[in-house]
Amino acid sequence: MSLSLWQHCLARLQDELPATEFSMWIRPLQAELSDNTLALYAPNRFVLDWVREKYINNINALLVDFCGSDVPSLRFEVGNKPVSARTTESVPKTVTHPAVNSTPTNSQPVRPSWDNQPQSQLPELNYRSNVNPKHKFDNFVEGKSNQLARAAARQVADNPGGAYNPLFLYGGTGLGKTHLLHAVGNSIMERKANAKVVYMHSERFVQDMVKALQNNAIEDFKRYYRSVDALLIDDIQFFANKERSQEEFFHTFNALLEGNQQIILTSDRYPKEINGVEDRLKSRFGWGLTVAIEPPELETRVAILMKKADENQIQLPDEVAFFIAKRLRSNVRELEGALNRVIANANFTGRAITIDFVREALRDLLALQEKLVTIDNIQKTVAEYYKIKVADLLSKRRSRSVARPRQMAMALAKELTNHSLPEIGDAFGGRDHTTVLHACRKIEQLREESHDIKEDFSNLIRTLSS
């Protein structure tokens, strides 16, 4: 049996799995084949458990394909494989980081002179970390829409600077990106009390740089930002058209990466779609791992409501949670805001929380949602997005240029309205409910396999929910 067995498995897995999944879970594995046993080494327990749960059947099937009856046994371990085996079985890297000119500094954090505060008033470490202690992994509600993002953030928290660097999270407003940033920061500081973790909105970075320039303290600014263990920046798209800020962040990024210091960035869009940001920065954003967070599906929305109610020590009936979740779909923030309103009204009036009570408490919000998202609106939005006519969506045409948008519109109608499958079918030229069901399943499958379809779905959800 050749020592290249794992390389053959890798090639097949790369073809079979979505690129994000392969990069996140399979690429970090190291392999050693010895005494008819294939040992797979994972960087941490989290990756090991995930691979064993999600991909062991894929791996075993490939071993049977390649080895026939002489299938090696499979063993999982945490750590690195023996040094003697690394030259032949290490997982190949596909990203090579160009050399950079910035020289990282390992000096202690310095007082930013642009803040004009006496040194004695500042903590020695972690000053102005801005990490919110309330946002942790334990109270982040996981679902299919955010599962990969949470898993990636968890790995980074367990191995900052060594797992995925940078980690780039993108998605619409209110989907949990900021929560994950804080969760990573909290986790790192729990493991290492004096860790130098800084969270900020991108506009704060710009403001700090402007103050540093005004106070002739740009060198202090550089030393401060290049001395952190983890830099967590929210809404990186606000760097757009700020050339000096981009220039400074470019060199800060390079210095941190060379020093194996963790960088996590968030944006409301895919890196290459951020207008007004230099190509060299957008390229670097993709050096590590880029993961999308999508609007939560029904089950996750219900779980979020139940979790929030539990935190407020409120008994929320299941049917009420489903009623709210079916009608408010755009983001987590909207869900939590609606529940806060329901709880406040219940406290003020002393009434029990029922569907009728919720319908009354949220009547303006529910009326707005029903007005905004209709099948007609979905059809018009999808037709405009794909540059076809609404009549094409209703026609019998089956060419891919029409069939795929039609399937997308049907899937969106199921996701964003309360219409039944037969009602959706009727609205699309009198189609059978099984056609609608097939369309929904097809789009769900394609969202897993195709970055373009995933982006189209997310973009249309944002447009229809805004």
Curated annotation (Swiss-Prot):
One GO CC term, this protein: plasma membrane
UniProt xrefs under InterPro entries: AAA+_ATPase, Chromosome_initiator_DnaA, Chromosome_initiator_DnaA-like, Chromosome_initiator_DnaA_CS, DnaA_C, DnaA_dom, DnaA_N_dom, DnaA_N_sf
Mind listing the UniProt keywords for this protein, alphabetically? ATP-binding, Cytoplasm, DNA replication, DNA-binding, Lipid-binding, Nucleotide-binding
The segments labelled Domain III, AAA+ region in the record are 130-346
Q: Name one Pfam family in it.
A: Bac_DnaA
Question: Is ATP-binding found in the keyword set?
Answer: yes
Q: Which SUPFAM superfamilies match?
A: P-loop containing nucleoside triphosphate hydrolases (SSF52540), TrpR-like (SSF48295)
Q: What would you give as a GO molecular function for this chain, any one?
A: ATP hydrolysis activity
User: Where in the cell is the protein located?
Assistant: Cytoplasm
UniProt lists the family membership as follows:
Belongs to the DnaA family.
Q: What is this protein called?
A: Chromosomal replication initiator protein DnaA
| Originating organism | Proteus mirabilis (strain HI4320)
